[in-house]
A protein has these predicted regions:
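Extracytoplasmic gate region of multi-pass secondary transporters
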Residues: 34-38, 224-277, 366-379
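Central cavity-lining transmembrane alpha-helices of secondary-active solute carriers
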Residues: 57-72, 271-284, 451
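Low-complexity, proline/glycine-enriched hydrophobic segments characteristic of transmembrane helices
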Residues: 106-111, 371-452, 484-492
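Helix-loop-helix hairpin linking two adjacent transmembrane segments in secondary transporters
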Residues: 151-152, 159-210
């Protein structure tokens, strides 16, 4: 897949490509800023790591649901109308999120528990509405770009999704320069800048329909694609990808900040790995031309597993940077290349199959990734402190209990108390505070090591697919020939 010729089908293809790029960039900015201010929320409102994981998980869950719904209605409602809806949801999400502080302050003196719960609801539903806006954009721009550039899907979907790490970089820099100096509410508002830009770019140009819709493929025939075992396997793998990439991204600056003993350094490391992703995604075309999309996915998943394992064991700043580099390079091409593979191999599915991939990935990140990694941190840290210093654990444990799926109920460490310890210099901490901090740090390290098993499993799945396609003469793109019920998928 050469990137030398766009082979686009519309004269306004590049304007729509960059409008989609800005929409995904807006999602990345908002996601990054929220990740950077998790510590502020924990300290201000007394949330545990599991509480914070559930808040971030709510955002990713909403993201996933709307991608699925949006994919089903995109061609019927129209891409332009859906982008306007996304803009409205982004605006409302800011209003609800910003309401958390005044509501909390008005209640905390008379009802501390109620104030905490009210703040939690504001942040959760604000995140959920933010995710609805993100999901609506995602439901539109993925099939849009795959349609605009039918012979270069992997290359241009990677360029489209360079907007995500670009947004993470912008949001991370905002957090780095403003953390501890500017209220989190002001940081939250800044993601509206790219929102306004993509909204303006979407006014005017005509949006095409997907390849499947152009060939008159019915909804029933689109849905029949899900009977293919390979598509079901790819959906399962993409669910794992959502867990490891987005679930980890929602925690990574927090965890590495603790490892580096500097919240600001954790944010800078996050910005660094996101910058790598941003730059490398513009070069997916030449790489895929040499090793195929599945080869790229296998290498990426393998690097991701190695990077997370090393990151969980790193003890010096240099080792943390090296480990994060391996992880960052590994995850760079996974998400957009998975979307491209599904679009190339199952074109009759149209927006529905590519939307299902994005939706499943986001749902997995929201339901399992964010909460699961938060739970793992709480579980390991609380058990470590409980075993070594039971009385100290009783002093620092949260007032509330948390549960994740079928795993045991736990009482994590109180976010406000642990946050106060983190804010102190090492020399200012008491021996007891050092012990609590060590348990907190250990929980973060082990959570990263546990997560490394997910990309390792993904790498095995990609290897099996590579071996399968070798028996079929190699990986090849599929196109639609014919119209209506006569439409068939043919290898080109």
């Amino acid at each position: 897949m050469s990137n030398g010729n766009s082979n686009s089908i519309a004269p306004n293809a590049y304007r729509l490509l960059w409008a989609g790029f800005m929409a995904i960039l807006a999602a990345g900015v908002g996601f990054s800023i929220r990740g950077g201010i998790l510590g502020d929320w924990g300290t201000q409102f007394g949330f545990t790591q599991s509480d914070l994981g559930n808040i971030t998980g709510g955002g990713l869950t909403g993201f996933g649901i709307i991608i699925l719904v949006g994919a089903l209605i995109a061609d019927k409602v129209g891409y332009g109308k859906l982008m306007i809806f996304a803009f409205i949801m982004h605006f409302l999400s800011a209003v609800v999120t910003l309401a958390a502080t005044p509501i909390y302050n008005s209640m905390v003196a008379s009802n501390p528990v109620g104030a905490k719960n009210a703040a939690y609801e504001c942040l959760f539903w604000g995140m959920f509405m933010f995710a609805i806006g993100n999901g609506t954009c995602e439901a539109v721009v993925n099939p849009l770009v795959a349609t605009l550039f039918p012979k270069n899907k992997t290359h241009y979907l990677n360029i489209l999704h360079a907007g995500w790490p670009g947004g993470l970089v912008a949001g991370g820099l905002v957090s780095y320069f403003m953390v501890g100096k500017v209220r989190w509410e002001i940081q939250m508002c800044l993601f509206m800048i790219p929102v306004v830009v993509y909204g303006a770019m979407c006014l005017g140009p005509k949006f095409p329909k997907s390849e499947a819709s152009q060939h008159g493929v019915s909804y029933f025939d689109m849905l029949k694609e899900f009977a293919a075992p390979m598509l079901l396997l790819l959906l399962c793998v993409h669910a794992m990808l959502g867990y490891v990439e987005l679930g980890t991204d929602s925690w990574i600056s927090n965890i590495t900040g603790n490892i580096l003993a500097s919240r600001e350094h954790g944010l800078l490391l996050f910005v660094y790995t996101s910058t790598l992703m941003f730059a490398l995604r513009f070069f997916a075309g030449p790489i895929v031309h040499r090793i195929s999309p599945l080869g790229l996915l296998f290498v990426g998943a393998t690097c991701g597993a190695i990077g997370l394992t090393l990151l969980g064991s790193a003890t010096t700043g240099m080792l943390v940077v090296i480990s994060a580099t391996i992880y960052g390079v590994g995850k760079t091409f996974l998400w957009p290349t998975m979307l491209a593979v599904v679009s190339e191999r199952f074109p009759k599915g149209g927006a529905i199959t590519i939307g299902a991939m994005g939706g499943v990935g986001m749902l997995s990140a929201g339901l399992f990734g964010g909460p699961g990694i938060g739970y793992n941190q709480d579980y390991v840290a609380s058990n470590d402190l409980k075993q070594k210093a039971p009385a100290l654990y009783d002093q620092y444990k949260s007032e509330t209990k948390n549960k994740f799926l079928v795993f045991p109920e736990i009482q994590g460490l109180n976010g406000t108390k642990v946050g106060n310890i983190r804010a102190k210099a090492e020399s200012e901490r008491t021996p007891e505070e050092r012990q609590v901090h060590e348990a907190d740090l250990y929980g973060g390290r082990m959570a990263l090591k546990m997560t490394a098993a997910v990309p390792a499993t993904m790498a095995l799945a990609y290897l099996l697919l590579i071996l399968y396609f070798k028996t079929q003469g190699g990986y090849k793109q599929v196109h639609i020939a014919g119209t209506g019920h006569e439409a068939k998928e043919v290898v080109t």
